Every structure is written in structure tokens, then in C-alpha cells.
């Protein structure tokens, strides 16, 4: 049977796609349905039809799955932030485990994978210490802020995200009220006009410090002293800055930071290590789970106090300083100059003198230091962005021949690709542990321990 756009089909959802969508079949025709849960029987409308598969919109749940739960957030289906709120948390962990395992098998070609049980979350909501809220106008002309609907730049108005902290709403209420009172225009992506693009909020989970950064299509916000006074009424307010981004693009942050009040950073803690975090810093958004993630990375590194460690894609030194507590010496590499300045300050803040940090691309710095300066490593730790490691970097890692490699990944597909490269060149998979950093979403972190085969 041939299916066309707008056809209605009844499906039993038998599987789950990597983006959390339910998968069912009608007369052999596979349909991917957002918001459907494995075990559901649903009616879906075909919104896109290919030869052997299509995409459907959930119209009605005829028989709910035993794994289906009521989403906590009323915007769960509209917003692009949470893909799994309708799925029980136990099944979310099963989904994420299978996602990692499936990528390692299909892309990496691994069998008999030494998987440890996924490390789940205790607090499923209000765990995010950072949020970026776009600002715009709705169809009625009202200034709104919230999150983008899935696969669009249409703002779903929501100042109180279920994954964020309560301080987010307090900040946004004051910023929007200030804009309305003084006629300040939100940015319009289509025209490139307007002033306020985004509001970035960071929160120190352990210190309770609050940071507000206004991303502007300009240098100054009108009546800024009155806005600062209003924001300072929020308990914990520590840093108020402006980020200037005049580019006509959808890139959120520019490079220029201007301090309005307080200091340019907040401080937070993971384990025994304190970190200074600036508006541009990369810092894990779930500090409770990050502590577990880094503890697992430290376990896999198996440090005894005599090792030289390279930490690639080190950010503000989050993993580096964890490692420095146990290693003889740690060298970190990060492409963002401001992050390296933060890393150096964080090392001083924690009294760790056995560290050195380099600015540059990991795939350029490591080969240079190895080939020109003869550096070596007992252990290499990598925590790359979603695209994974550059092959030049992997090649140098293999040439350096460290005893152990620890790979921390936010994308199990590129992880599998890179592990295949390393394991074809003298390393073996010793341990794999998924860590749920992002409950209610499809994202999962993975820590992998690799050992050189001749040891």
C-alpha cells in the first residue's frame, strides 16, 4: 500500500529512534512519530512520505504504553528542549543505554562491549545551571521569551522551564518588564533589526551565585542602571554583563563582553574543586551528574601520582583540575583563549601548580608539542565537541602511545567512529559507562576507558 502526505494511519509503536521518536509500521511502511512512546498504539498523520518510510504527527493515543507518563511541563510537545518527558525515567535510561550500545555495534563494529550500568539522575528536574532564552515578538506583537519549537526559530513562551532554576523566571520577568517600560525592541532575525537578542543566565549550584548576560545587537541597553538595580534585588546576583553580537546570523554569542555590575564570573564547585565561570565559558550544565562523570573518568584514568596526563578540549580546566589532584602533571589544550585564562585562574584558585595550559586546536597543539618538543603522555583524556576528534589528533595520540586513553563523549555516534580508529591501531576497549547528564532529553554522555594492548 502506498502512503501519501496527510494520510491517517494506526500504528503500534515498537521501537524508539535515536532522537526519541516512536517507530511503528503500517503494511510494512515505517513511520517515525514524534511524541509517541514505545508500547503506544496511536493514530498518526503522515507529514512527509518517502518510498519505504515517512514521518508522522501524533494525533491520538488510542492505547497508552505502560511506559507513558504525564509530562511535567505543559509545553513539552511544542518545545524543542525535552524529547522524552512522556517516557518513564526507567525507560529513558534503557533508551540511552541502547543508543550508546547500538552506535558502538553499528558504527564501531564492536561486540561483547564491556558496558557498565548507566549512571542515572537523582533530581530529574531543575538541574540545569545555564539557560539561553531568545527574545522576540509573537504574532500579536507582544514581547516574548522562552525556547524555540523543535526544528524552528519560533519562540514558545515559557519563562519557567521545568529543567531550569527558579531564578530564571525572576530574571526574565525583570528584563521583559524593563523592555516594555522603555520601548526596547527585541531582535528580529529576519530583518537584523532590534536590540535584545538573548538573555543568558548561569547559576552556581553550590554557591547560589547568579549571572545575567544580555546579548545585544548593540553596545548599550537604555536605562541600564535601572535594569541593574532591578536585577540586583534577586538573591545571589553576582554578575551582570552585556555581550555584543552585531552579526546578522543565528550565532548566539559575540566575542565582546562588557561588565555592567559585579564581577565577570560566578564561582561554583564540582567535588573539591572550585571554578570561576564567565559568560563564554564551557561548563557542564548538570553539576551533580558532572561530579559522577568526572569521578568515572578519573577511575578509568587509574592515576597513581607519577603520570603525565594530557587533557584535550579542556575548557576552563574542569577535568584537568580533577586529574591534577591525582597525577604528577597535567597539560590542557583548548581553542578558546578566554577559557584558558579561566583554566589558569582556576588552577591558582585551587592551589594546583602541576598544570600547564595551551591555547589552540587540539589537532594542532598536540602534534606540535609531540614532534617539536618531544612531550609524552602516560594518559590522554579527550572530551571533544559533538563532531568528535580530528583524525590528525587521533593519529598523534596513537604515535604518542600512552598506556591509557579516556574518552568522554557527548555524541555516541562520533565516539564509536573514533574508538574504531583507536582500536584498529593498538588499543582495546576496557570499560564503557553511559552517564545521564540531561534527563528528559535524548542526549547522553559516555565515558570510555581504553588500554594499550601490549600492557
Predicted regions and their residues:
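Short, aliphatic-rich beta-strand segments
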Residues: 201, 208-217, 274-278, 379
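Rossmann-like S-adenosyl-L-methionine
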Residues: 2-10, 18, 223-234, 238-455
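Short, solvent-exposed loop/turn elements at beta->coil junctions and helix N-caps
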Residues: 116-124, 189-190, 197-198, 202, ...
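Residue-level signal for inorganic ion chemistry
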Residues: 24, 39, 82, 199, ...
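Terminal RNA-binding accessory module
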Residues: 1-75, 356-357, 362-364
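Short, acidic/hydrophobic/Gly-rich beta-strand patch recurrent on exposed beta strands
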Residues: 22-27, 146-149, 213-215, 343
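Short beta-strand micro-motifs enriched in acidic
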Residues: 45-49, 134-138, 202-206, 453
Amino acid at each position: 500500500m502506498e502512503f501519501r502526505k496527510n494520510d491517517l494511519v494506526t500504528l503500534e509503536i515498537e521501537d524508539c529512534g535515536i532522537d526519541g521518536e516512536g517507530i511503528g509500521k503500517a503494511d510494512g511502511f515505517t513511520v517515525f512519530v514524534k511524541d509517541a512512546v514505545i508500547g503506544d498504539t496511536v493514530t498518526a498523520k503522515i507529514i512527509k512520505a518517502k518510498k519505504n518510510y515517512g514521518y508522522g504527527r501524533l494525533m491520538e493515543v488510542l492505547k497508552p504504553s505502560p511506559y507513558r507518563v504525564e509530562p511535567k511541563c505543559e509545553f513539552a510537545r511544542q518545545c524543542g528542549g525535552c524529547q522524552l518527558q512522556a517516557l518513564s525515567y526507567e525507560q529513558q535510561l534503557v533508551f540511552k543505554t541502547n543508543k550508546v550500545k547500538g552506535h558502538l555495534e553499528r558504527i564501531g563494529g564492536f561486540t561483547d562491549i564491556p558496558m557498565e550500568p548507566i549512571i542515572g539522575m537523582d533530581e530529574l528536574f531543575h538541574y540545569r545551571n545555564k539557560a539561553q532564552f531568545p527574545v522576540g515578538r509573537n504574532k500579536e506583537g507582544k514581547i516574548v521569551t522562552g525556547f524555540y519549537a523543535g526544528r524552528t526559530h519560533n519562540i514558545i513562551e515559557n519563562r519557567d522551564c521545568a529543567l531550569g532554576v527558579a531564578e530564571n523566571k525572576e530574571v526574565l520577568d525583570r528584563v521583559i518588564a524593563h523592555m516594555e517600560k522603555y520601548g526596547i525592541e527585541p531582535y528580529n532575525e529576519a530583518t537584523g533589526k532590534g536590540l535584545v537578542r538573548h538573555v543568558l543566565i548561569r547559576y552556581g549550584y553550590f554557591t547560589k551565585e547568579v549571572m545575567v548576560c544580555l546579548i545585544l545587537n548593540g553596545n548599550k541597553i537604555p536605562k541600564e542602571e535601572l535594569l541593574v538595580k532591578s536585577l540586583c534585588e534577586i538573591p545571589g546576583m553576582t554578575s551582570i554583563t552585556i555581550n555584543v553580537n552585531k552579526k546578522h546570523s543565528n550565532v548566539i554569542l559575540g566575542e565582546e563582553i562588557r561588565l555592567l555590575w559585579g564581577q565577570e564570573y560566578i564561582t561554583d564547585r564540582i567535588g573539591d574543586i572550585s571554578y570561576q565561570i564567565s559568560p563564554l565559558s564551557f561548563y557542564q550544565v548538570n553539576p551533580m551528574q558532572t561530579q559522577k562523570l568526572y569521578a568515572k573518568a578519573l577511575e578509568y584514568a587509574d592515576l597513581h601520582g607519577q603520570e603525565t596526563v594530557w587533557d584535550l578540549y579542556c575548557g576552563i580546566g574542569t577535568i584537568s583540575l580533577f586529574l591534577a589532584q591525582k597525577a604528577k602533571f597535567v597539560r590542557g589544550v583548548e581553542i578558546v583563549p578566554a577559557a584558558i585564562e579561566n583554566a589558569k585562574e582556576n588552577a591558582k584558585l585551587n592551589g594546583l601548580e602541576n598544570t600547564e595550559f595551551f591555547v589552540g586546536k587540539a589537532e594542532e597543539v598536540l602534534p606540535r608539542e609531540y614532534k617539536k618538543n618531544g612531550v609524552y603522555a602516560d594518559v590522554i583524556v579527550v572530551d571533544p565537541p559533538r563532531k568528535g576528534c580530528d583524525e590528525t589528533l587521533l593519529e598523534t595520540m596513537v604515535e604518542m602511545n600512552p598506556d591509557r586513553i579516556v574518552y568522554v563523549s557527548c555524541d555516541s555516534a562520533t565516539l564509536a567512529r573514533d574508538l574504531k580508529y583507536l582500536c584498529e591501531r593498538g588499543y582495546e576497549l576496557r570499560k564503557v559507562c553511559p552517564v545521564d547528564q540531561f534527563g528528559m532529553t535524548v542526549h547522553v554522555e559516555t565515558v570510555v576507558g581504553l588500554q594499550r594492548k601490549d600492557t
